[in-house]
Regions:
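Conserved catalytic phosphorylation-site environment of P-type ATPases
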Residues: 66-68, 168, 268, 278-354, ...
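Membrane-embedded transport module
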Residues: 242, 505-507, 544, 549-622
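Actuator/coupling domain of P-type ATPases
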Residues: 19-122, 135-142, 149, 160, ...
């Protein structure tokens, strides 16, 4: 609890004790009335001040005005206990609402804790100086001790350590880093001392982008929130005028037909009507439900840019994936060596050496599979043949490594390969020596992710890729994806998403999931753009509506389940609050409901709705 909540709780306790003592003591009226007024002012003075300020600023119709009119009117009718009770229970409801917001804000606050307070910079004498991260320029060497946060994105130039990325990803799995590895701000250094050369200013670093995203999330309202805001602006004046009509019209009608006017009875009913009609339960609980949903999601590494996107995700029926980096790891690995005429280890060594001067991902995968240091003194006359492969002399032997076009260029008969992937054919001194199959590996939970989406109510899954048909079909088959479109250029992907959008029903939404690097146009075009694996990707954070901070595709279904739970709670609160209020308004108008039932219809319903809204935080086991 913050200071304001503690102060309000003390006021509630003092007023409650005083109220109970007065009710139990059965004091004379001349003592009881002043004590009730003391209790009333102790608990309600701020509401009266807000109502007065609202009238002064010509912003009359709000819940403070309703409470002030209802309770002052009750005092005028000498219902001092009811006036005090209405104000007391209203403040209890407000305290619950404040506490609930604080509880849901806690997850956001924990995320805000990723913001570093300082960066360690060495001065000319080699001493460490703590400076504001905003003052650190690009290219500065910062020092991160064990237990400290990485202040700014950069590259490790000295040291090795383990980083805790839990605040960013929602996962506790640590990440090992050493020299030349990229690191991002917001991670916590767990073990060794690191020296990092900054590659960005603090304002452009990952942690700043994320904090900006979360801080602005509440400004993008859902349709439900926008409706409730419009509803409250119209509803509050309507019920005020209705209460005035309830107070004036029946007595006037009674006078016309020569019956007693009974103004006191109808004033009491009108005041009861006002208390019942207070729209707090809706106005408070619906934004709180979305706020709690966004807070719970952020705690799981799912960053939602606004409640409108959370609402849209709940109606998602189609999920379209990019392949590379989304459903596959985007890291090529040697999957097999076939038809080798020399030992496989030797063939792999020749391939790695021939490709050692290239920066192509295929070359990197061969070097990784070989695993040893390349002795470049053994390599001569390296020639890269564009679109074909590489020719080199290794230990005095001519080596060819490339595709079938390279083999045809040198008239070397080769073996066809039926495996799916990139095929690197090898020839030694003009004779075919076998081929190496290199494949992009599926992500560990990719298949489970598709199954989870089906269970979450997704009607169709689609994969778009620029890869060849054979590779795309194999991946789609392994993952049980419903449709696959291959050999697409970036613009083709946008066109295909537009085509899919035209086929869906108006109330259904389509989400596109990409790695956020080359997918910005498609992420923007879909109803909901989801970027995954966005740790360190500025493009993803900018282009997407929802950002998954790690590479686990299972988070997609989790995000959908969070959205559905949040919307379910919103509608529960709408139906419950409106239903109870309508019944109580009718009972109040015909004189059956008294002020105590009005208190339940207002404060009781608000507390129940607020407690229900807090459930949107509990998303860990979804």
């Amino acid at each position: 609890m913050n200071k304001k909540q503690k102060k309000m709780l003390k006021r509630i306790i003092v007023a409650s004790i005083l109220f109970i003592m007065i009710k139990v003591a059965k004091l004379p009226e001349y003592i009881e009335i002043p004590l009730f007024l003391v209790a009333y002012l102790e608990i309600g003075y701020d509401i009266l001040l807000k109502a007065f300020k609202g009238i002064s600023n010509r912003q009359v119709f709000d819940e403070n005005f309703l409470m002030a009119v209802a309770t002052v009117g009750a005092i005028g009718l000498k219902s001092f206990d009811e006036a005090t009770a209405v104000m007391l229970f209203y403040q209890i409801g407000e305290w619950f609402q404040s506490y609930a917001v604080g509880k849901s804000r806690k997850n956001i606050t924990e995320l805000m804790d990723i913001r570093p307070d300082y960066a360690n910079v060495e001065d000319e004498d080699g001493n460490l100086e703590q400076v504001d991260p905003d003052e650190v320029e690009i290219g500065t060497i910062i020092v991160v001790k064990p237990g400290e946060k990485v202040a700014i994105d950069g590259i490790v130039v000295e040291g090795s350590s383990t980083l805790n990325t839990a605040a960013l990803t929602g996962e506790s799995l640590p990440r090992e880093v050493s020299e030349n590895d990229k690191v991002i701000s917001g991670c916590i250094n767990m073990t060794g001392l690191l020296k990092i050369k900054t590659t960005k200013e603090f304002g452009e670093s990952t942690v700043s982008k994320i904090l900006d995203l979360v801080e602005n999330a509440s400004s993008k309202k859902s349709r439900s929130e926008a409706f409730i805001s419009r509803f409250a602006r119209i509803y509050t004046p309507v019920v005020c005028y209705s209460a005035l009509a309830l107070f004036l019209l029946p007595p006037v009608f009674n006078l016309i037909i020569s019956n007693p006017a009974d103004f006191g009875t109808w004033l009491y009913r009108a005041l009861t009507f006002l208390v019942i009609s207070c729209p707090c339960a809706l106005v408070i609980s619906i934004p709180l439900s979305f706020f709690a949903g966004i807070g719970g999601a952020s705690n799981q590494g799912v960053l939602v840019k606004g409640s409108n996107y959370l609402e849209a995700l709940a109606s998602c029926k189609y999920v379209v994936f990019d392949k590379t980096g989304t459903m596959t790891q985007g890291v090529f690995e040697v999957a097999g060596i076939h038809h080798a005429t020399i030992p496989e280890e030797k063939l792999l060594e020749y391939a790695a050496m021939a490709e050692s001067y290239s920066t192509h991902p295929i070359s990197k995968s061969l070097l990784k599979a070989y695993g040893n240091t390349i002795d470049k003194s053994r390599i001569e006359n390296v020639e890269e043949i564009s679109g074909h492969g590489v020719k080199a002399v290794i230990d005095g032997v001519q080596v060819l490594a490339g595709n079938d076009k390279l083999m045809k260029m040198y008239n070397i008969p080769y073996q066809e390969c039926h495996s799916v992937g990139t095929i690197v054919h090898m020839a030694i001194d003009g004779k075919y020596a076998g081929h190496i199959v290199i494949s992009d590996m599926l992500k560990p939970h990719a298949k489970e992710a598709i199954e989870a989406l089906k269970k979450a109510g997704i009607k169709q899954t689609v994969m778009l890729t620029g890869d060849v048909k054979s590779v795309a079909d194999k991946v789609a088959s392994e993952l049980h994806i419903d449709k696959v479109y291959s050999e697409l250029l970036p613009q083709d992907k946008v066109n295909k998403v537009e085509e899919l959008l035209s086929l869906k029903q108006p109330k259904e939404n389509l989400a596109f999931v990409g790695d956020g690097i080359n997918d910005a146009p498609v992420l923007s075009r879909a109803d909901i753009g989801i970027a995954m694996g966005a740790l360190g990707s500025d493009a993803a954070i900018e282009a997407a509506d929802i950002v998954l901070m790690d590479d686990d595709p299972l988070k997609i279904s989790k995000a959908i389940k969070i959205a559905k739970k949040c919307i379910h709670i919103v509608y529960e609160n709408i139906y419950f609050a409106i239903g109870i209020k309508l019944v109580c308004l009718i009972l109040g108008a015909i004189g059956i409901a008294n002020m105590w039932l009005a208190i339940f219809a207002d404060v009781g319903v608000m507390i129940i709705a607020v407690l229900n809204a807090i459930r949107a935080l509990n998303v860990k086991n979804l």
